[in-house]
A protein has these predicted regions:
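N-terminal assembly/attachment segments of tailed bacteriophage virion structural proteins
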Residues: 1-133
Length: 133
């Protein structure tokens, strides 16, 4: 059994979510960014350290009020790289959440092979029902 994917929620992401909901809008996660730089993200992050590719969310649904399931396919790169950082971007381009580990990669993207990504993302730092996919 896998554990929930727990990225760091960014301050910019929290601000964008609250601005959207105060305007009567929803904050929509529309893209997943992949990078190959290992680091220890903080809430001050506004972008990945070394983004390789930004891909649209393929599918998503809410598992609970503060947990979502997101899928995406990285199929455009012919270059090989280790996925060491992941970012979740809102419709307005704001980085909502970021994950990285200083020493452990998440996956490997081989040239000419699609990489199917599926994330169960815990967003417990955000109030219920503010995020859509």
């Amino acid at each position: 059994m896998s554990s929930a994917f727990k990225p760091v929620i960014t301050q910019a992401g929290i601000t964008a979510v609250f601005n959207a909901t105060n305007s009567g809008l929803e904050a929509n996660i529309v893209a997943v960014a992949l990078g190959d730089q290992s680091w220890s993200p903080t809430s001050a992050a506004t972008k990945l350290k070394k983004e390789k590719r930004r891909i649209p969310v393929g599918n998503g649904n809410k598992l609970s009020p503060n947990q979502i399931h997101i899928t995406a396919i990285e199929d455009g790169q012919q270059q090989a790289y280790w996925v060491r950082e992941v970012g979740f971007y809102l419709e307005d381009g704001t980085l909502l959440a970021v994950w990285s580990h200083p020493s452990q990669p998440l996956a490997y993207k081989a040239p000419g092979v699609d990489l199917l990504l599926a994330f169960d993302v815990a967003l417990s730092a955000l109030p219920r029902s503010l995020i859509q996919i």
